[in-house]
From Swiss-Prot:
Top-rank lineage group of the source organism: Bacteria
Membrane topology, from the record: Multi-pass membrane protein
Record keyword Transmembrane present: yes
Species this protein is from: Synechocystis sp. (strain ATCC 27184 / PCC 6803 / Kazusa)
Similarity comment: family membership: Belongs to the GDT1 family.
Listed InterPro entries: GDT1-like, GDT1-like_CS
Designated name of the protein: GDT1-like protein sll0615
One Gene Ontology cellular component annotation held by this UniProt entry: plasma membrane
Biological process terms in GO annotation: calcium ion transport
Record GO terms (molecular function): metal ion transmembrane transporter activity
Amino-acid biosynthesis keyword on record: no
Length: 206
């Protein structure tokens, strides 16, 4: 049986590898000192996770049965979308994600106008990461998990998953990106969402 911690950890680790946030962290780490980038990126991801968990807790006043049905439905929708996307992903998908990340960084730097030194790098990394994660499927999935599972477990698992992906992106992102198949990662992500849907149905509804 998947615990809240394990669910959060698996969900984030699989979903975040090779996405836009991953490439934002990788590109920033190639421009600035890695330690400052890592602090900012992990901070932004942790803040988004905590906010998502709090948003999930808001829905706990609803009847548990409705929350459980909504959780299963969301996992099925996300799983289906990811499997559909996996069929259509091109061989150049990673390059497209990197281009999107570069555009997001360029746009963010124009708006922020922060001196790229020390804590300025932390603030830039934090802001770019937080904005990139807003509305992302992992944020919505985290909200769904937190609505019907232990909030502390979901938070700890999701933050650890984000940290693992951030460390990989910052320390060896370029090396890893060349070896990650977005099609494979997306396919695994879709199957994982289906697994969550089945487990949630079996343990909470059936």
């Amino acid at each position: 049986m998947l615990t809240a911690f394990t669910a959060g950890l698996l969900l984030i680790t699989v979903s975040e590898l090779g996405d836009k946030t991953f490439f934002i962290a990788m590109i920033l780490a190639m421009r600035y000192p890695r330690r400052w980038v890592l602090v900012g990126v992990v901070g932004g991801l942790a803040a988004m996770t905590i906010l998502s968990v709090l948003m999930g807790q808001i829905f706990t006043f609803l009847p548990t049965r409705y929350i459980n049905y909504a959780e299963v439905a969301l996992f099925l929708i996300f799983g289906t979308k990811l499997l559909w996307d996996a069929r259509r992903i091109k061989a150049t998908a990673n390059l497209e994600e990197m281009e999107d990340a570069e555009k997001a960084i360029a746009s963010g730097e124009k708006k922020l106008k922060i001196v790229p030194r020390g804590w300025g790098i932390v603030v830039e990394s934090f802001a770019l990461t937080f904005v990139a994660e807003w509305g992302d499927r992992t944020q919505i999935a985290t909200i769904a998990l937190a609505a019907s599972n232990n909030a502390w477990g979901v938070s700890a698992g999701a933050i650890l998953g984000h940290t693992i992906c951030a460390v990989i992106a910052v320390m060896g992102g370029k090396f890893v990106a060349g070896r990650i198949s977005e099609k494979t990662v997306t396919l695994i992500g879709g199957l994982l969402f289906y697994l969550f849907a089945v487990v949630s149905w079996w343990t909470k509804i059936a």
